[in-house]
Amino acid sequence: MEEIEGYTVVPLRMSSDALHCHSVYMREHFIRLMDPNKPKGRTLFLLNIPPYVTEESLKGFFKRAGNVESVQFAAKPGKDETIKWYEGTNEPFSNVRPPFIFKVAYVVFQKSSSIGKALAVPSIDLFHSSGESTIKTGMELWHEESPNIWPTTTEESERAALAAKNSEADADGWVTVGKEGRNAGFEQKESVIGRLEKKRENDTKTKELKNFYTFQIRESKMQNIVEMRKKFEGG
Amino acid sequence: MGKIKKIQRKGPPATKRPPKAARTESTDSALGLDAHSDLEKPATSSDDGFEEPTPKPKPSKKTTTLPEPVSIIAQKKNKFRTDDAKNVKPPTLEEMKELRDTRNLFHSNLFKLQVKEMLEELQLKTKYTEYIDNWMESFTVFTQRLKDGLVEKSQLEVPLNVDKKISGFIFSKPTKEPQLIGAASTGTLLGPKIVVDVALEMPKDCLHKDDYLNLIYDQKRALYLTYVTNQMRSDPAYSQDKFAFNYHGNNPLKPVLELTPAAKHVSKHLQLRLFITAPQSTFKPGRFVPWNNNIRPTYYNDEWDEEEALPSTQHYNASVLFDLTLAQNQALLDKAFKGRRNFQDGLLLLKVWLRQRELDRGFTGFGSHILASFIVYLNQQRILHQSSSSYQVARTVWNQLANTDWTNGITLAPASGQTEQLSTIAGYYDVCFMDVSGQLNLCANVPLGVYQRVRAEAKLAVDLLNDMKLNSFPYIFMQKCPLYTRVDNILKITNYSSIQQMLVLHSKPQMKYDFASYGYPQLLQILTELLQKGLKQRVQAILPIETVSSAWPVESKAPIIGQAIQLGLILDPEHAYEVLDKGPSSNDDPEGSAEFRKFWGEKSNLRRFQDGSITEAVVWGTTKDAPSKKRLIVRQIVMHLLEHHLQLDSKDIQYIAAELDLVYQLSPWFKVSKVKTKLELQQDTDAEALSPNVIRCYDDLARQLHALDDLPLEIVSISSISPVSRYCEPMPVLPQARMMADHIHASHIQRVIIQLGQSGKWPNELSALRALKTAFLIEIGEKLKAQCRLNWSITSEGLLVLKRGFCFLLELAHNKELALLKQEVTERGVTKYVDNPESRALEQRHYILPKVSGALHSLHQSHSAYGPTVLIAKRWLATQLLDDGIWPPMATELLVAHLYQQRNAPQAIAAPQTGFMRLLHLLAHSDWNGELFLLNFNSSWQEQQIGDLEHSFRSDRQSYPPLALATSYDQQHAGRLWTTGESPSLRILSHVSRLARHALEMIETSLQSKDLRFVRPAQLFRGSSEGYDLVIQLKSDLVPNALSYDLGSPFVSFDQPNYLLPRAGKDPLAAIVHQLRSAYSDYAAFFYNPHGGKELAIMWRPPAVFAPKAFKVTELQACTLCDKGKVQVVRETLVEDFKVLLKDFYLRISTPEELKREQREHQNPKRYFNAKPQDNESCSKSKKRKLAKAAKVQAPLKRKSLIKSRPLKSLS
């Protein structure tokens, strides 16, 4: 078993006779500010996961070390990286997919004893005993993807989505007050606020004489020169 | 023009800004901004910032002369300093003047700076001027040492081909000193090859008064040259130099000595040419007037009727006069140019302009000495003022060129000097510009076509200068526009016997005497007259394309030139493709009718037309013919005329037109008869001819959609955004989409964007909105099925609809979706709308692309060559293994549109092939870093906006992608919408430039060569196999072939093609390559031909990427552990990854060399990666079989193809 800077290095094999394999670097996940989704003592941290590896395939493999609660990916180690990774992918009717790049993985086991077992595996084998890979690539992948990508029927999810909007009082008895209703207030948009601020500015501004005093005329001429310089020399 | 390098935009030199100087009363009055300055008027000699004709007091001087108000300024200065110390500095008089003039003369300072910088770069280095001066000195001494004597047979050949040679020429030493002439004398030498012309005058003693007759003068001139050359060669001062003879201006009567000095520091760029002239008083003044004959018919042993007047030899006379009047003309030019930097610079600008257009070449060229004389002429006429700036000189010359007509003659000679009637002289020539002596026509050899071309170019230059929305500098000076890219078709006759046949049988004897039996101008005249008469308004101009004769060593015999001719035809797209030539009515004009019949021969038939008239007419095709066929009508006519009138066989002629149009034709492998459709399809159809079918079908669909009943919301607009709708789809789209087992299969999908009427009831949440959109699409689909009986299916992208064998993908566009995508909530709870890549893509697809599509469609309507040009360009890029992922297809379309929209040539392009060559030029020579390609459709952008954009582009170049494109519809994203930093990346962009340069080289060589045919499409449209590290060969039966004409892959030879229909909108190969790029682009680049390419070429990134490096958690991607605690990326591992991702698709992996070797040896191809010797054959085979089995289960639709694949492979 090779080790480097506290990481256990194991090859990731796609078939039983694979010669050139990627190295996966693993260790127990430990940082000061723990993420509740990656509980201390039960989470295995893996570096350098090839892009085509899926959550299911890792979950399937690490079952041998104990029951796996979840597998999460991220582009790099860090606090909110996992959230960023999955951003937009869980929404219905969205075509967003997680990026297809080398990534890191967090395997959360149900028992902390599984970590040691997991760190002792000689290699991560992502193929069945029959030799077939547990990851779908190539022709399989592109033929499987069916045009109906949404799980529920369209109408149902539509209804669900619409229902989410017209929310009544929630469990604690709070009602979300939106822009509907009698006293909705103005919309908190940048453009609206900007317009209001501009209006106020205009109101406060007194009417002033612009081309009256000699110094004003001189200054406007000056301004003219500045503009000409900017146009013909600046840039 | 290697010399004119990219002109970097520089700020104004620091010295220009004068020190804080007095702000006097006069500055205030100067601020009055009386902005009137007529550019054409010479009287307002305003300074535009160029070198002043008169020295100007230096600003520093100025401050010293006005010392008084200093105390006042001191206060004021402080006041201004508080504002903005940099910009609000009191202006000086000079600065005010300069600023104001800049504003009046130029739209922007940029043009001025660019011109100034170019002129600076064109200035001759002192080492050359010094060398020339020294050389002249020593040469003068040399000529004085020459001795008189009889010229014996020297070892040098006399550089002249004449029938009857004279003997006993007695050399007498020159009495006058040799002189610099031409550019060297006027101080307007232009690089990169600096040619210094020196004239040596033969003394009168050498010539007799009868020598004017029958080329004796020319022979003596040549003998004199030979003698001087001989003497120079034996002189130690010159013996090291390289001697060669050449013809001046492709004129075989004007041999000159070309001397390349041996001196190291100049020999690369400097060349000296020695002309021999004769004093003007040698012959009687009236001897060489145009109507005199100076070559007798008897000289050529021809009979001539004694009674008849001898034929005039005006062109020959002009050739002699050129020598005789040279000294006088040069004196005039010297007087005008010496010491006037402004005139010299003006001429330099004009010379650059002319040379970029290649109009000054060869016998018929519009030489720059004509321009120099014209400047003098304008000065004489008081149109150009002595103190006009160089810019004004150039501008006035263009303006006057465009607006005057020289066919009636203009003259430099003073009223007393012009003895003969100008109009009489003009009658003998096409174009007439008399010199100062009033005898020589400077434009004697310039044919009307070339002159008209120069005028058109000059007019364009003025228009470009006047166009406020454009920085015209690159178009006028920087862009190289060789003639062949400006003509639509090229006629090339190089066959020796055909040329002789034309000269002997069809040239009039008078022409032979006139040109002293020089073949070229005779051929030119014969062909131009014939073609002009036959093509009439189909052709706008017929231009000679000359190649400059090459020098020959002095020991060898002078070559005979003019034995080949190349003509360029500029077509008038409005008339060129008419299928009918109608003659005069046979009843009203029987004579004209007979003549018409005689002219056209058997092609002409008596026809009765619908309006009842009966006339002779020639029919070249039917109106229903495909556009590509119609484009060949002119070729048909030319071929017929040449055969009928000049008895030239089509195999002796090369007519270069539409050779490259082949690439978008339907592949001959695909049999059209197999497509079930009601449309009439031809086997030899092409993508261009098929597009209207799709567009018609789309129109029908749009009508049906509009007519749908009971939709909850009305359909407001429907627009198509597919390339087909703007004639830019290079693959022939055939109506073969169909429903198979609940799935629609189609080779292409046509994207259609639908907008619905307004409603306030759309949800405020993205997924809900998308859900509702999908529901809407399903509703539309169901209604289409019920009301119009069209099949549909829903996908994640939109609604697929099948109609008449075409497949459409309908998408709903909604404003709210865009807003929701952009929406961001700040910490203060304020909603903000910010662009992000996703929203930008959506906006482009749903809102901008429909508009641009419409604009491009209308561009195609006005320029019918636009579409086909794009087709050729897209095919070319595809065959160079550049797919959509690395070169966005819209970039191609917009660049071609840019070519058609920008008026960088006086005539619009009529032939797609020419359009493609111009695109190659654009790709090869563009300064990507400095240029933003703006397509101002409908001129909807204002000057101010354009100015702002260009300003931001220049000052903030980094934030724009390497190739910046903007249209008038994408203002807020200008320059960033169509291209990104990755597609095309800087690397790809320079790669494309290189490819384009290579392609142009091939085209140019084939055009210039006498023997080569025009470049074959297969030479251009097959990528190179060099430079790639690995090639992954894909299974040929899994990748459908392109429907367009395939010219083969760079790696393997032809294989059995397949035309499987993929599932609509699915392109697995493209998807996999996209994956590969997103994961592995740091380590390798991937290339494939998106038009049915069956190989994936891979290029590794530089070795540094694969070097061992220290362990770092954040930089571990794809790294394997190696020695000493270091990690590294291993190529073999990556190859394994590629194999995993390309599972089922890849046949084997090898290097291109291996592949080539195998192809050559026709070996049994090895199945798997060769670099893996352990790979045991039986194992892989069994694995393969298993895979095939798996694929069969997974994809029942592919079963047929997979079974087919086995016998196929056993064949190979």
Swiss-Prot record, chain B:
One GO process term, biological-process aspect: tRNA export from nucleus
Region annotated Disordered, chain positions: 1-72, 1156-1212
InterPro entries found in the cross-reference section: NOL6/Upt22 (IPR005554), Nrap_D1 (IPR035082), Nrap_D2 (IPR035367), Nrap_D3 (IPR035368), Nrap_D4 (IPR035369), Nrap_D5 (IPR035370), Nrap_D6 (IPR035371)
Comp. bias (Basic residues): 1197-1212
Keywords, alphabetical: Chromosome, Nucleus, RNA-binding
GO molecular function: RNA binding
Gene3D superfamilies: 1.10.1410.10, 3.30.70.3030
Domain of life: Eukaryota
One Pfam family linked to the record: Nrap_D6
GO CC terms of this entry: condensed nuclear chromosome; CURI complex; small-subunit processome; UTP-C complex
Location(s), subcellular: Nucleus, Nucleolus; Chromosome
Principal location class: nucleus
Subunit structure, as described in the record: Part of the small subunit (SSU) processome, composed of more than 70 proteins and the RNA chaperone small nucleolar RNA (snoRNA) U3.
Family of this protein: Belongs to the NRAP family.
Its job: Part of the small subunit (SSU) processome, first precursor of the small eukaryotic ribosomal subunit. During the assembly of the SSU processome in the nucleolus, many ribosome biogenesis factors, an RNA chaperone and ribosomal proteins associate with the nascent pre-rRNA and work in concert to generate RNA folding, modifications, rearrangements and cleavage as well as targeted degradation of pre-ribosomal RNA by the RNA exosome.
Protein name as annotated: Nucleolar protein 6
Originating organism: Drosophila persimilis (Fruit fly)
